[in-house]
């Protein structure tokens, strides 16, 4: 799967050619497709045509009817071939056809037993290969279902039925989505829309659904936009245009209308789809880049909010019209699969050479041509590991499915290989290393000697004007809202203290009756704790807002005066409320509020006092927020106008205008919040460090806060001359990539950073040769996630843009899941090495046994059917079970694997040759001994060299038992079964595979029907005991190797502990 591919929704990245020299045509032509048609209709006309509502959408019953009628919202795909046809295609392999030709020749020459035996054996081999390929395809299909895409929508559901929806396929809308004023400026209608919003699988969308989308979302279907706020959409995967396109709800009525709303792009990039009409004949439709009121399926929202009506799903979308060309593009194979292909090819050449030598020697010795031909082809089938690439794919896919059950969804198979090479993990602090539930623990304002505990000093918090002002600002400059359950049954302020911020002991998750940004929720939880009511519904309307961003590091709102009903932010009595990072707030304040409520000039000594109080809280690992308020200065700029307290702005102002309005404020105080570390994160960090993986924490918090939290997590924070354990965003701005690459070797914390700094950190680490994993959740994190070797997006809080760029998604947003994923990545690679060892040692042993027997002039010890049976064991369940061996818990003590490391290492080749030699030597010894177990009647005292069915049965069974013991030794390269390091029955699939193989072998030698096919005869208990003693030698020899290696490792480290700890 390619880097740009997505499991559930393939995106087409058109290759942009050189820019066009002419301006885009914006005139409206005669429409012939749904998007073209609806782009000319207004929102009301669109709703009327699709028989839906602009406020409430469809009813669930109507949506169900349309889903049954139109089918799921999925891109068209080719129907798979019937299983019987795919099974017959397995017979197209050259070696299989040669074996069938051998069977046909035997039949015509009267050797009916051989003909039937070869045909049956070939059928068994083909069946095993077919089952393997089928499992591989099903495993890959399961991967595509790991990342289901969702859509936020409004459906007309009565309040009594809402809980039923939540228990089925819907859930409460995420806290980061603002809906008010998108469809109506009425606060009541917006509130109703919020309560009715739901999250459903994108595949369940139908035409007429009312869909909501915001920054970072992927558009789930073709949508006619009915309301938008600062909405821009990235359509590069559809049109090739690199710049996000501004979107508007107005209909394209004429050429003039189209021009007036088009983005200011003089010469957009060209692509096969950019100038193409919407799924119609050239020149007949409105081009895709002109449809500024259509959001196309698969495109990504870069900024703003939007609402619209679904007009096309599945094959009826613009993506659906080009999906046929996508189906013809095969996903590239992973590097490991390509290396297995090359290995198989090289081994094929060697095998053909050895087989040709065997056939030539046999013919020179006067053996029958048909016999040597059949043996040669059978050896080719057994010796050439044609199943190796398939088993690699199955192992990777099954490993990914196991990782998904543990909370890590790998979106691309090559990423599994890279996981074992990761030696640096860059992690966000909030939500990944911590619980992402802030709780206010301390507060400070002037005239306080030091920050006080809010829960221990309730009188200070509720009696003083300064403390009450801090709470008031935190309440007003706040976008958190009641959760759907709390909104439908609101609690009083007195009872909210009991309901707010409870802990679910079963899951460890912290619950609140509020939803929104963690800092906003923490402040409202504090209000609940002290029984204070939410004031936002009782004060004047919010007339403007400056939203928080990682670059700005503060947010502010402007509340209109009671006398000013018009939504203007220039009223004489408007008041600004601001909260954010200390330095950003402090620079906007001229005065401060004393404990008794007086305003005093904020001079430099008092600013220093504020900074000391903030540093005191930050040193305890608290996140510090500053609060201020004051009258709005009269400016001439524009503003963001709102209809209610949590509305989304309808227009935007310049950065300068925003700064001018939030100046000359009164500083109120500080609040310290605590986001506790996740459970066992400190253990995960220690285990990663023990395995040679550095952990770097990236946070927007202050330096002292970051250091305090890092120490709690057990991260190395050592400040020594010439090195700095912490770098800030300002330090990064001043450093070049080369300087950062040099300094980063001693740095484990980056504080006061923005998403843009992540890209610089990744480049610096990669320039040193590090393999980097980077976490992120926002739109601005996407470039760094894509640049990193392993981009890790958050499953709960991450945007669709971040998930699109990532290689791995954490469904629980937990750092410990990264450790489990790296463990699995390492384990999968070593498991692949183990079954390669098993397959190659079996293949080499079979070839060398037949070659040596031929050179010594013996009759072939194994007939064609027996060789094909060995091939089934080599490529079948025993080999596959080695690929799913449980991961060794001590695997993290091994250093990360080099990206250029070969699969076939020197120790692996030595294991292959040792095991193959033991198998060949022991099997040949049994064969020679059994040939001489009877007297030669013509020469008294001389042993007979006549090969009987008993001789070949003993040889055949000896080889199979050798194979089983060899598979047992290949379960681990270093762990011993005898010393109890490797549980004998720890791999259930391996147990079943061995039992099945032994049962099959018993059938071959004891069931009369199979005796005739494989030319065997029954063995007694004494024979089996002798074979067990001989065949177990490969196990004892490998156990001895493991013991000697363990002794060497203990001597190397002195006391038996890993040198990395």
Swiss-Prot record:
Disruption phenotype: Leads to osmotically suppressible basal growth defects and cationic tolerance associated with increased expression of calcineurin pathway genes. Results in hypersensitivity to cell wall inhibitors but does not affect virulence. Leads to severe polarity defect, hypersensitivity to ER stress, and attenuated virulence; when srcA is also deleted. Ca(2+) 2 binds at residues 875, 963. The chain crosses the membrane at residues 91-109, 115-131, 344-364, 381-401, 838-858, 912-932, 946-968, 990-1010. Gene3D superfamilies: Calcium-transporting ATPase, cytoplasmic domain N, Calcium-transporting ATPase, cytoplasmic transduction domain A, Calcium-transporting ATPase, transmembrane domain, HAD superfamily/HAD-like. This is Calcium-transporting ATPase pmrA. Its main location: Golgi. It catalyses: Ca(2+)(in) + ATP + H2O = Ca(2+)(out) + ADP + phosphate + H(+). SUPFAM superfamilies: Calcium ATPase, transduction domain A (SSF81653), Calcium ATPase, transmembrane domain M (SSF81665), HAD-like (SSF56784), Metal cation-transporting ATPase, ATP-binding domain N (SSF81660). Its EC number is 7.2.2.10. Residues 110-114, 365-380, 859-911, 969-989 are lumenal. GO terms for biological process: calcium ion transmembrane transport; calcium ion transport; fungal-type cell wall organization; intracellular calcium ion homeostasis; intracellular manganese ion homeostasis; macroautophagy; manganese ion transport; response to unfolded protein.
């Amino acid at each position: 799967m390619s880097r740009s591919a997505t499991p559930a929704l393939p995106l087409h990245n058109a290759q942009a050619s050189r820019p066009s020299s002419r301006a885009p045509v914006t005139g409206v032509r005669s429409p012939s497709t749904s998007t073209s048609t609806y782009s000319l209709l207004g929102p009301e006309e669109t709703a009327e045509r699709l028989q839906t509502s602009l406020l409430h959408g469809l009813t669930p019953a109507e949506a169900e009817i349309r889903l049954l009628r139109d089918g799921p919202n999925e891109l068209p795909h080719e129907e798979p071939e019937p299983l019987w046809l795919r099974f017959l295609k397995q017979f197209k392999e050259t070696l299989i056809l040669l074996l069938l030709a051998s069977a046909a020749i035997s039949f015509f020459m009267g050797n009916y037993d051989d003909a039937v035996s070869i045909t049956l054996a070939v059928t068994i081999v083909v069946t095993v290969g077919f089952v393997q390929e089928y499992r591989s395809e099903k495993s890959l299909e399961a991967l595509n279902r790991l990342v289901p895409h969702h859509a936020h929508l409004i459906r007309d559901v009565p309040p009594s039925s809402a809980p039923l929806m939540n228990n089925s396929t819907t859930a409460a809308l995420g806290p980061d989505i603002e809906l008010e004023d998108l469809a109506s400026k009425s606060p009541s209608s917006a509130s109703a829309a919020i309560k009715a919003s739901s999250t459903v699988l994108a595949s369940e969308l139908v035409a007429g659904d009312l869909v909501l989308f915001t920054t970072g979302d992927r558009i789930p279907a073709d949508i006619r936009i009915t309301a938008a706020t600062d909405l821009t959409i990235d359509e590069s995967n559809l049109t090739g245009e690199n710049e996000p396109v501004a979107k508007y709800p107005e209909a394209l009525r004429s050429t003039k209308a189209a021009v007036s709303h088009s983005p200011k792009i003089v010469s957009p990039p060209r692509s096969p789809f950019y100038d193409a009409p919407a799924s119609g004949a050239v020149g007949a439709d409105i081009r895709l880049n002109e449809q500024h009121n259509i959001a196309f399926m698969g495109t990504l929202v870069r900024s703003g909010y939007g609402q619209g009506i679904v007009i096309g799903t599945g094959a009826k979308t613009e993506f659906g019209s080009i999906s046929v060309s996508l189906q013809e593009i095969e996903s590239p194979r992973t590097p490991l699969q390509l290396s297995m292909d090359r290995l198989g090819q090289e081994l094929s050449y060697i095998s053909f050479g050895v087989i040709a030598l065997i056939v030539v020697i046999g013919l020179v010795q006067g053996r029958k041509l048909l016999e040597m031909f059949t043996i040669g082809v059978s050896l080719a089938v057994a010796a050439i590991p044609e199943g190796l690439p398939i088993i690699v794919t199955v192992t990777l896919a099954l490993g990914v499915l196991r990782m998904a059950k543990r909370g890590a969804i790998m979106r691309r198979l090559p990423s599994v290989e890279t996981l074992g090479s990761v030696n640096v993990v860059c992690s966000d602090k909030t939500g990944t290393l911590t619980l992402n539930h802030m709780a206010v623990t301390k507060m400070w304002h002037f005239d306080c000697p030091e920050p006080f505990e809010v829960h221990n000093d309730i009188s200070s918090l509720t009696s003083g004007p300064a403390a009450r002002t801090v709470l008031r600002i935190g309440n007003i400059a706040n976008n958190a809202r009641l959760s759907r359950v709390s909104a439908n049954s609101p609690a009083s302020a007195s009872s909210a203290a009991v309901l707010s911020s409870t802990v679910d002991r079963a899951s460890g998750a912290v619950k609140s009756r509020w939803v929104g940004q963690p800092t906003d929720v923490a402040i409202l939880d504090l209000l609940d704790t002290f029984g204070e009511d939410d004031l936002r519904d009782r004060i004047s309307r919010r007339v403007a807002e400056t939203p928080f961003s990682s670059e700005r590091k503060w947010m502010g709102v402007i509340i209109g005066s009671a006398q000013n009903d018009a939504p203007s932010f220039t009223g004489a009595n408007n008041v600004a409320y601001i909260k954010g990072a200390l330095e950003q707030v402090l620079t906007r304040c001229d005065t401060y509020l004393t404990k008794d409520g007086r305003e005093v000039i904020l001079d430099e000594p008092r600013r220093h006092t504020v900074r000391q109080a903030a540093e005191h809280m930050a040193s305890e690992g608290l996140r510090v927020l500053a609060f201020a308020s004051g009258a709005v200065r009269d400016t001439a700029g524009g503003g963001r106008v709102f209809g209610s307290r949590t509305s989304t702005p309808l227009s935007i102002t310049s950065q300068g205008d925003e700064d001018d309005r939030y100046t000359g404020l009164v500083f109120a105080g500080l609040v310290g919040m605590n986001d506790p570390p996740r459970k066992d994160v400190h253990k995960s960090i220690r285990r990663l460090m023990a395995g040679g993986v550095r952990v770097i924490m990236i946070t927007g918090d202050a330096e002292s806060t970051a250091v305090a939290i890092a120490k709690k997590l057990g991260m190395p924070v050592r400040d020594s001359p010439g090195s700095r354990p912490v770098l800030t965003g300002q330090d990064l701005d001043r450093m070049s990539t080369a300087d950062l690459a040099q300094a980063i070797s001693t740095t484990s914390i980056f504080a006061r950073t923005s998403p843009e700094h992540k890209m610089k950190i990744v480049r610096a680490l990669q320039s040193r040769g590090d393999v980097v994993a980077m976490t992120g959740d926002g739109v601005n994190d996407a470039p760094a996630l894509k640049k990193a070797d392993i981009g890790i997006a958050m499953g709960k809080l991450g945007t669709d843009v971040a998930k699109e760029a990532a290689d791995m998604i954490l469904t629980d947003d937990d750092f410990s899941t990264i450790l489990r994923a790296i463990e699995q990545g390492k384990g999968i690679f070593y498991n692949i090495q183990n079954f390669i060892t098993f397959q190659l040692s079996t293949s080499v042993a079979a070839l060398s046994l037949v070659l040596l027997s031929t050179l010594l002039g013996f009759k072939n010890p194994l007939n064609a059917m027996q060789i094909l049976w060995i091939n089934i064991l080599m490529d079948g369940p025993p080999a596959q079970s080695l690929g799913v061996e449980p991961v060794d818990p001590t695997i993290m003590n091994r250093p990360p694997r080099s990206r250029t490391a070969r699969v076939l290492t020197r120790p692996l080749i030595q294991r292959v040759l040792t095991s193959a030699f033991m198998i060949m030597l022991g099997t040949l010894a049994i064969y020679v001994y059994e040939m001489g177990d009877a007297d030669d009647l013509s020469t008294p005292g001389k042993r007979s060299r006549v090969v009987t069915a008993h001789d070949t049965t003993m040889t055949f069974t000896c080889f199979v038992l050798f194979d089983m013991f060899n598979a047992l030794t290949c379960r681990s390269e270093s762990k011993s079964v005898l010393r109890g390091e490797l549980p004998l029955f720890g791999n259930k699939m391996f147990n079943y595979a061995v039992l099945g193989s032994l049962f099959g072998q018993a059938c071959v030698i004891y069931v009369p029907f199979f005796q005739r096919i494989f030319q065997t005869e029954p063995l007694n208990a004494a024979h089996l005991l002798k074979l067990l003693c001989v065949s177990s030698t490969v196990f004892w020899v490998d156990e001895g190797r493991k013991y000697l290696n363990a002794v060497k490792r203990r001597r190397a480290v002195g006391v038996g502990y890993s040198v990395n700890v």
